[in-house]
Swiss-Prot record:
InterPro entries to which the protein is assigned, alphabetical: PRELI/MSF1_dom (IPR006797), Slowmo/Ups (IPR037365)
Protein's UniProt name: PRELI domain-containing protein 2
One GO biological process term: phospholipid transport
PANTHER family: MSF1/PX19 RELATED
PROSITE patterns: PRELI_MSF1
Pfam families reported for this sequence: PRELI (PF04707)
Sequence ranges assigned to domain PRELI/MSF1 in this UniProt record: 1-187
Length: 189
């Protein structure tokens, strides 16, 4: 089955400022769930100018304790007990392609933890707004699907959907705050 969350936001700041703020967004005291972000790889294609980055984020496990306990007692294959969600942190991998010439950045993220039971993927784009070239449009689609935990698949997907929506809104608020702090008031129409 799976659940999807779509986000669309226009930042009234130039593309370069928005991307710079995005790349410095975490860790941040406004979102204590993101513990650290580390650049694993960064390279520039000299012919196109595209900058590729791979980052790993370490985040707190936000699955409620009641769901962790329920799932930790599941018996899977050979009657072996597994602790599916009893981990303190999760890892996310983010890849981005920044094209300064065309003023766009594509981002793909996925979860490296729980891959046997869950698939979490996000695709995002920052691009110059068609409405105003001094503004930046942000479009994101996130998808989570849970398998292998029976009737709890739906419960976990519902929780994940709510968490994704709230996280997206929190991310937008953090970006707006950072942009205002670093760049001043938004640009007028």
């Amino acid at each position: 089955m799976g659940v999807s969350v779509d986000v669309h936001q226009v930042y009234k700041y130039p593309f370069e400022q928005v991307v710079a703020s995005f790349l410095r967004k975490y860790p941040n005291p406004m979102d204590k769930n993101v513990i650290s972000v580390k650049i694993m790889e960064e390279k520039r294609d000299e012919s196109t100018g595209v900058i590729y980055r791979k980052r790993i984020a370490i985040c707190q496990n936000v699955v409620p304790e009641i769901l962790r306990k329920s799932l930790s007692t599941l018996v899977i294959l050979c009657w072996k007990k597994v602790s599916i969600l009893k981990v303190p942190n999760i890892q996310l991998e983010e890849e981005s392609w920044l094209n300064p010439r065309e003023r766009n950045m594509a981002i793909r993220s996925h979860c490296l933890t729980w891959t046997q039971y869950a698939s979490m993927k996000e695709e995002s784009v920052f691009r110059e707004s068609m409405e105003n070239p001094n503004w930046t449009e942000f479009i994101q689609r996130g998808r989570i699907s849970i398998t292998g935990v029976g009737f709890l698949n739906c419960v976990l997907e519902t929780f994940a959907s709510t968490f994704l929506r709230q996280g997206a809104q929190k991310g937008i608020r953090i970006m707006e705050m950072l942009l205002k702090e670093q760049c001043g008031a938004p640009l007028a129409e």
